[in-house]
Amino acid sequence: MSKIAILTDSSCDIPQEMAEKYGIDIMSFHILLDDVDYIERESCTNTEFYDKMRAAKGVPSTAAITPIQFCEKYCQYVDEGYTDVIHVPINKSGSSTYNNALMAQGMLREERPEHHLKIHLLDPHTYSMVFGWYLCEMARKLKNGAEISHVIHEFETQMDCMEIVLGPYSLKQMKKSGRISAAAAVMGELMGIRPIITLIDGKTRVEAKVRGDDKVVPAMVELCKQRSEGVENFDYMIGHTNIPQTTDLEKACRKAFGKPPLLVFELGGVVSANTGPDTVALVYTGHPRG
């Protein structure tokens, strides 16, 4: 009889109660900010981390989970009698974590040469609850008797059409991290320019620029409507950093799409370290990219 584990990392942004409900195993990233090492999901709450970023002098940096850490986790599964582990780490193009997991498989063969654990390593090509939600769906279906090959195929098919629109209300973090120039950030702040950014297949792109905070939510919703027009089984989620505009985005989405979001969730430390602590995100079903 199969005994299956689902393993991911803290970039998934799965709320703790959902992780416990579906038995999702989450390994935490370390985030360094102003010489202080924070363990995501352990050292502080998301809200506390947003406040620390706003007050920080420097830029947060994240450390990839190491091959040794992954090997130890795989060994644990072997020792506990698991037959399979579905391992979905952070987007491969944005971190060395995926490659570290590959290295750990070789280390496992040395540590447990007689092991029979099947490791299904998947690249979600994205971040946050864009894949976190569907890991929970995967766990639910496995519990109801679905085959591993079936849930993996469904997951990969779903990831092929998921998109994110980001609305940052401050350019401070992007300036610090070098994602935009200091001059562009200063001019943007002075003129109230806000970029509307898509995150698709792990790549960011500025799709539009609006002037004034009140234009951000309408632009995000309009872009989502354009990119998802004609999509069957459309759904959406809202990510946030506990800012007032979260409510504005949810109201606008309910009106535009005629349905509530699957989930309203907090952006975790790894994600907000890149987007900044004053950001809302609209996650939605787009067209398959093939």
Task: Identify the meaning behind each predicted range.
Residues 5-71:
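N-terminal glycine-rich anion-binding loop in soluble enzyme alpha/beta folds
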Residues 5-7, 85-87, 267:
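Short glycine-aspartate micro-motif
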Residues 69-108:
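N-terminal glycine-rich phosphate/adenylate-binding segment common to multiple enzyme folds
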Residues 3, 11-25, 30, 36, ...:
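Mixed-charge interfacial surface used for oligomerization/domain docking
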Residues 58-65, 89-96, 125-126:
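Short coil/turn segments at secondary-structure boundaries
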Residues 20, 79, 113:
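Anion (oxyanion) recognition and catalysis
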Residues 55, 83-87, 111-122, 264:
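Glycine/charged-rich beta-loop-alpha catalytic/anionic-binding loops adjacent to active sites
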